Amino acid sequence: MVVRVVMFSAIFLAAANVPAAAETRDDGGRLGIGQGANSCWAWTRSHEAKAATQGLYTQWVAGFVSGLNWNTDDPDILTEMDFDGLMAWVDNYCKANPLAKVTTGAAMLVQELRERAQRK
């Protein structure tokens, strides 16, 4: 009986630490899924704690920005900023806007990068 309780507790604790699938919708109703649907507060907390989810967030943002960059005829928005610069931008955005979604921060980053690329 004790073994069952210990096993159940271990499984429960392990499952509780697995990030849940998240989703969000933009103003136009388009669905977004993954870590980007979480709050900027969660992003900041994850990065400050150097939690395992930190990599999930950063890779989600990298994929979001890269995908939007590849799926356009606009100028390449990633020629002037490296990975660390992108993450620093989102860090700053999320610290200033803890209630916003990570998706919103990533979209604002893309908007900023597009504006910079068009000025060149």
For the regions a language model picked out, list residue spans one by one.
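Intrinsically disordered, low-complexity linkers and terminal tails enriched in Pro/Gly
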Residues: 15-18, 120
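Short N-proximal segments of mature Sec-exported proteins
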Residues: 26-92
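Boundary at the C-terminal end of the N-terminal hydrophobic targeting segment
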Residues: 20-24
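Bacterial N-terminal signal peptides
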Residues: 6-16
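Positively charged n-region of N-terminal signal peptides that target proteins for export
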Residues: 1-5
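C-terminal partner/receptor-binding element of secreted or periplasmic proteins
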Residues: 98-120
